[in-house]
Amino acid sequence: PLTSSAASDVYKRQLLSLFNSVLLVGEHRTIIHEGIEREYILHVPENLNNDSSIVFVIHGYTGSAEGIAAYSGMNSIAEREGFIAVYPQGTIDSYGNAFFNVSYEFNDESTINDVSFIRELVKSISHEFNLKRKKAFATGMSNGGEMSYLLACTSSDLFKAVAPVAGVLMKGLKDSCELNSPVPVFEIHGTADKISLFEGDFNNEEGWGAYYDLPSTIDFFAERYQLVNKSVKQITSKESGADYDIFFERHWTDDLEEEVWMYRIEGGRHVWPGSKFKWWDDPLARLYFGSGNEDI
């Protein structure tokens, strides 16, 4: 058996480990929603004030809240920009995988309402921290990107902008997309993505359900918002030493604040932009907090 001194040391190490985990990732929380215990991670910046925003960072299919908190690097941006970062955890589907219900064909019998879950988090967190804005932002990887599109189409009253990474617009969602008010969109997508196909899968050959190609997806939102101006410019070049040729497509109109953007990564695969890809950091922050200036 441990001596009292040794037991105390073990306890201190456990507390330190827990503290470091909370510091690096965030606070693990649960909430009962529609009779189900749901989990999420909350990271609150040191410079929080009642004008701060909430940014939801949503993991992909089979992923986890902890995983995307670690690889997205969003906590460091939250500290810099002063927003609350929230990482919701999906539920487990019939195949044993964590997911968010965006009506994939193989999850078509699921009754999980992730829109309602995230809406409840927006309201409860806004109330807890006395936030004035009462509006949130969403980004996510793959399945989390599709969830971001779903929130834009169903919850424009609570979400100010979405930034899907390797996300696609499901056909069923496009057909029912409400968009009562414009929600800015910033999509980041690789042309060599073999899971969320850049060219789409309208015939559902992969089994996820029919979804649109990325150019059609971006055009859909731009047309719905009546954004009449379009520009495409190259922002990184392999010839200049970059890992990829990256093109920035921007849709806007002079009398509307909302815009639609896409970063097309030539040869990019199904990954979240890593720390060496600094090109995604500032544009993401600008979409959330800035003026939408074209100069990146």
Predicted regions: what they are:
Residues G60-S64, G268:
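Active-site glycine-rich loops that stabilize anionic/oxyanionic intermediates
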Residues Q89-N113:
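Cap/lid segment of the alpha/beta-hydrolase catalytic domain
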Residues T191-V260, G268, G274-G290:
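Active-site-adjacent alpha-helix of alpha/beta-hydrolase-fold enzymes
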Residues L15-I54, E66-S72, I77-R80, S110-N113, ...:
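A domain-start/cap signature at the N-terminus of enzymes
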Residues P1-Q14:
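Single conserved hydrophobic/aromatic residue that forms the stacking wall/gate
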